[in-house]
Amino acid sequence: MARKLSIKLAINEAIDQEMTRDPSVIMLGEDIVGGAGADGEKDAWGGVLGVTKGLYAKHGDRLLDTPLSESAYVGAAIGAAACGMRPIAELMFIDFMGVCFDQIFNQAAKFRYMFGGKAETPVVIRAMVGAGFRAAAQHSQMLTPLFTHIPGLKVVCPSTPYDTKGLLIQAIRDNDPVIFCEHKNLYGLEGEVPEGAYAIPFGEANIVRDGKDVSIVTYGLMVHRALEAAATLAKEGIEAEIVDLRTLSPLDMDTVLESVENTGRLVVVDEASPRCNIATDISAQVAQQAFGALKAGIEMVCPPHTPVPFSPTLEDLYIPSAAQIAAAARKTMKGGKH
């Protein structure tokens, strides 16, 4: 039976159900229990935005408050995974991955390969991503492309409560390291979520809107900006098909290519910095594999190549908008076949 849950509560429920099902699932992070683990503060906070609130009461010391040292507790989580546990490490912001990058890309991502397929590292690293939270340059980045570049890592960025729960359960059960990206501006988004546990396989994009004129490919918060743009375009007689990638590594290029072959036009939207991001990757692959199907040049909608501004006015201008997406789609409709 389904009921409406926010993305924040969908994450909480996924972790709760997996911790109940599997005693090897543990969780580490800063203030995920309470005020630095002080007895009087236990379960008072549940992380910076309260995502894990209530889990300590059910699962006790399997949730561990850690010092403000991402390098230490991410390293501990990776080591625990190598020893048979299924840790979930929560970083407040993906921006802090920099201080534990060696543990992630030089250790966790490579163990299976270095040990001839015999080693497993079932660790999930959860982190908030994206701008729009008025949190300035060091707490607002969309660094997903950094991790898709690294073989051995799986990268997930859901856009709905349903997908969030199913993909997080899949991530916890997966035997490889997963970077699970949660857009901070989507935590309050509500949608239908089944009560029971379910897993959504990685590498399967979702067509969230059918259309015949132009394909809009994106992920995370930008899915909702794309839907807003599509509603505007529909009033002008332009029907946009929207592909929600859901997982960025593995990347479902088959669905993207099939959509482009049906519409002949492509707009790729990415909140990440425009150099070497998901949009450039998809654009290159479509140009290589489906050039003959294109009726117009590929359009990319990305932020400028700058740090995320602190000024609310500038930050709003920095983030790709529905108006920009609609303008890019209109441009493809006017383009001639090259």
Swiss-Prot record:
What Gene3D superfamilies would the database entry show? 3.40.50.920, 3.40.50.970
* Record EC number: 1.1.1.-
Q: Which InterPro entries match?
A: THDP-binding, Transketo_C/PFOR_II, Transketolase-like_Pyr-bd, Transketolase_C
- Give the record's GO biological process terms: acetoin catabolic process
Report if keyword Oxidoreductase is assigned: yes
The record's section on CDD domains has: TPP_PYR_E1-PDHc-beta_like
What are the entry keywords? Acetoin catabolism, Oxidoreductase
- GO MF, any single term: oxidoreductase activity
The induction text for this entry reads: By growth on acetoin.
Pathway annotation from the record: Ketone degradation; acetoin degradation
Q: Pfam families, alphabetically? A: Transket_pyr, Transketolase_C
Q: How does it assemble?
A: Tetramer of 2 alpha and 2 beta subunits.
Stated role:
Catalyzes the 2,6-dichlorophenolindophenol-dependent cleavage of acetoin into acetate and acetaldehyde, in vitro. The beta subunit is probably not the catalytic subunit of the enzyme.
UniProt name for this protein: Acetoin:2,6-dichlorophenolindophenol oxidoreductase subunit beta
Organism field = Cupriavidus necator (strain ATCC 17699 / DSM 428 / KCTC 22496 / NCIMB 10442 / H16 / Stanier 337)
Gene name for this UniProt entry: acoB
